[in-house]
């Protein structure tokens, strides 16, 4: 049986963790290193650190904050935001990231994905796909959800796998921060189209949502932010719930 992972996400702006709804209306939640440490203690399997304003502001990821966060963790840390080159990937890995998430750059300069995968291994390369429902399908949006690439999300997932992505971080923009549940249809479509692990993101609001995205959509991991920041769900209790429901989790 596949062991499912619970991942806590830190959306970082100006060095502080924030959270909004559908990528808008951001509210301050705390310090990245402090929250990361707390989530590891609570039983998170991994931490994702996303510098959400780096690309839009045309700057690189805040390496100092990455180092601080990595220094308090013994679980894997994925870092994204503001990555434009293979050198940026290298800098993040040498400053404490275990994996690097590529989002906008993957769509605008796909060769970075394949080059990073060759140089550092697929296990270090995560491609983040921010998808929004358009018509009967889903389209890929970049630059913090502000730019429609015209790419079909499921087709794009297949392509990034071929380019060397070792994992896909799939976020439903429609569900982000709503706490209405993950987009099961979107997640299932990407899981079926690819062989690499898929992390479901966007919409977690209660334990049942995690169960559904694992059992019905087949996600390998489920990511959440706001419900953990606000104490709506404790990770340890969530894992107990999933285990009781027959889902294999690390305890």
From Swiss-Prot:
List the pathway annotation: Amino-acid biosynthesis; L-histidine biosynthesis; L-histidine from 5-phospho-alpha-D-ribose 1-diphosphate: step 5/9
GO cellular component terms, alphabetically, are:
cytoplasm
Give the Enzyme Commission number.
4.3.2.10
Q: Where is the major localization of this protein? A: cytoplasm
InterPro entries, sorted:
Aldolase_TIM (IPR013785), His_biosynth (IPR006062), HisF (IPR004651), IGPS_HisA/HisF (IPR050064), RibuloseP-bd_barrel (IPR011060)
- One short Pfam name that applies is His_biosynth
The record's top EC class is lyase
Please give the catalytic activity noted in the UniProt record: 5-[(5-phospho-1-deoxy-D-ribulos-1-ylimino)methylamino]-1-(5-phospho-beta-D-ribosyl)imidazole-4-carboxamide + L-glutamine = D-erythro-1-(imidazol-4-yl)glycerol 3-phosphate + 5-amino-1-(5-phospho-beta-D-ribosyl)imidazole-4-carboxamide + L-glutamate + H(+)
Q: What terms describe the molecular function in GO for this protein?
A: imidazoleglycerol-phosphate synthase activity; lyase activity
> Could you mention a single GO BP entry for this protein?
L-histidine biosynthetic process
The residues annotated as the active site are 11, 130
The compartments listed are: Cytoplasm
**UniProt keywords, alphabetically:** Amino-acid biosynthesis, Cytoplasm, Histidine biosynthesis, Lyase
HAMAP family per record:
HisF (MF_01013)
| Protein function | IGPS catalyzes the conversion of PRFAR and glutamine to IGP, AICAR and glutamate. The HisF subunit catalyzes the cyclization activity that produces IGP and AICAR from PRFAR using the ammonia provided by the HisH subunit.
Q: Which family does the UniProt entry place this protein in?
A: Belongs to the HisA/HisF family.
The record's PANTHER family line, in alphabetical order, gives: IMIDAZOLE GLYCEROL PHOSPHATE SYNTHASE HISHF (PTHR21235:SF2), IMIDAZOLE GLYCEROL PHOSPHATE SYNTHASE SUBUNIT HISF/H IGP SYNTHASE SUBUNIT HISF/H (PTHR21235)
Q: Which NCBIfam families match?
A: hisF
Q: How does it assemble?
A: Heterodimer of HisH and HisF.
List the protein's name. Answer: Imidazole glycerol phosphate synthase subunit HisF
Q: Which organism is it from?
A: Metallosphaera sedula (strain ATCC 51363 / DSM 5348 / JCM 9185 / NBRC 15509 / TH2)
Source taxonomy: Archaea, Thermoproteota, Thermoprotei, Sulfolobales, Sulfolobaceae
């Amino acid at each position: 049986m596949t062991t499912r992972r619970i991942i806590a996400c830190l959306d970082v702006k100006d060095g502080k963790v924030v959270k909004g709804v559908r990528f808008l209306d951001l509210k301050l939640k705390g310090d990245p290193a402090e929250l990361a440490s707390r989530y590891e203690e609570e039983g998170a399997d991994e931490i994702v650190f996303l510098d959400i304003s780096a690309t839009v502001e045309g700057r690189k990821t805040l390496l100092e904050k990455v180092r601080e966060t990595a220094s308090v963790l013994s679980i894997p840390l994925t870092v994204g935001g503001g990555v434009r080159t293979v050198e940026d990937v290298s800098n993040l890995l040498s400053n404490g990231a275990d994996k690097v998430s590529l989002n906008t750059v993957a769509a605008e300069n796909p060769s970075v994905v394949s080059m990073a995968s060759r140089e550092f291994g697929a296990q270090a390369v995560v491609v983040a796909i921010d998808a929004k429902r358009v018509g009967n399908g889903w389209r890929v949006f970049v630059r913090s959800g502000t730019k429609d690439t015209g790419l079909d999300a499921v087709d794009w997932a297949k392509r990034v796998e071929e380019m060397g992505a070792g994992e896909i971080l799939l976020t439903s923009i429609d569900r982000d921060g709503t706490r209405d549940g993950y987009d099961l249809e979107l997640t299932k479509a990407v899981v079926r189209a690819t062989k690499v692990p898929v992390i479901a993101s966007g919409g977690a609001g209660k334990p049942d949502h995690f169960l559904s995205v694992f059992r019905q959509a087949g996600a390998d991991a489920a990511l959440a932010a706001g419900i953990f920041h606000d104490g709506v769900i404790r990770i340890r209790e969530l894992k107990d719930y999933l285990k009781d429901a027959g889902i294999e989790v690390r305890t």
